[in-house]
Amino acid sequence: MHPLLNPLLLALGLMALLLTTVIALTCLGGFASPGPVPPSTALRELIEELVNITQNQKAPLCNGSMVWSINLTAGMYCAALESLINVSGCSAIEKTQRMLSGFCPHKVSAGQFSSLHVRDTKIEVAQFVKDLLLHLKKLFREGQFN
């Protein structure tokens, strides 16, 4: 065999082994990737976010903006999002809006209204958030995560 052939074959063999290893690790990496967040964790995170909002109020939340009150018994995540999505220019509730959209099975857009709104009653965003927080804490204690 030619003396230069051995190092060349060795280098090609190592490159093939390295490429095989990279491909195998890439394929197996999908098995270790995180799955969907359990509903209990998502609800706990939403509760924590609402606690942060209510505790860190130095000025009126969202400049005292008003939202439609909602029925907190059924389909409340989408109804809450529908109310809050109509508040513009309030960075304090943006994370809450994103979190609520994770609980709502359909896309919600501004101006959309559900039958779950109590259409004759508007309340301040701060009171809305407090009411929602109390209700979510109750659901969490009762183990109702969906």
UniProtKB/Swiss-Prot annotation:
Cellular compartment(s): Secreted
Function: Cytokine that plays important roles in allergic inflammation and immune response to parasite infection. Synergizes with IL2 in regulating interferon-gamma synthesis. Stimulates B-cell proliferation, and activation of eosinophils, basophils, and mast cells. Plays an important role in controlling IL33 activity by modulating the production of transmembrane and soluble forms of interleukin-1 receptor-like 1/IL1RL1.
Protein name (record): Interleukin-13
Glycosylation sites noted in the Swiss-Prot or TrEMBL record: 52, 63, 71, 86
UniProt keyword terms in alphabetical order: Cytokine, Disulfide bond, Glycoprotein, Secreted, Signal
Record-linked PROSITE patterns: INTERLEUKIN_4_13 (PS00838)
Quaternary structure note: Interacts with IL13RA2.
Pfam families in the cross-refs: IL13
Family classification: Belongs to the IL-4/IL-13 family.
Entry-linked SMART domains: IL4_13
Disulphide bridges: 62-90, 78-104
Example GO biological process: positive regulation of interleukin-10 production
InterPro entries membership: 4_helix_cytokine-like_core (IPR009079), IL-13 (IPR020470), IL-4/IL-13 (IPR001325), IL-4/IL-13_CS (IPR018096)
Keyword Disulfide bond: yes
GO molecular function, one term: interleukin-13 receptor binding
SUPFAM superfamilies found in the cross-reference section: 4-helical cytokines (SSF47266)
GO cellular component: cytoplasm; external side of plasma membrane; extracellular region; extracellular space
Signal peptide feature range: 1-24
Associated clinical condition: Allergic rhinitis: A common disease with complex inheritance characterized by mucosal inflammation caused by allergen exposure.
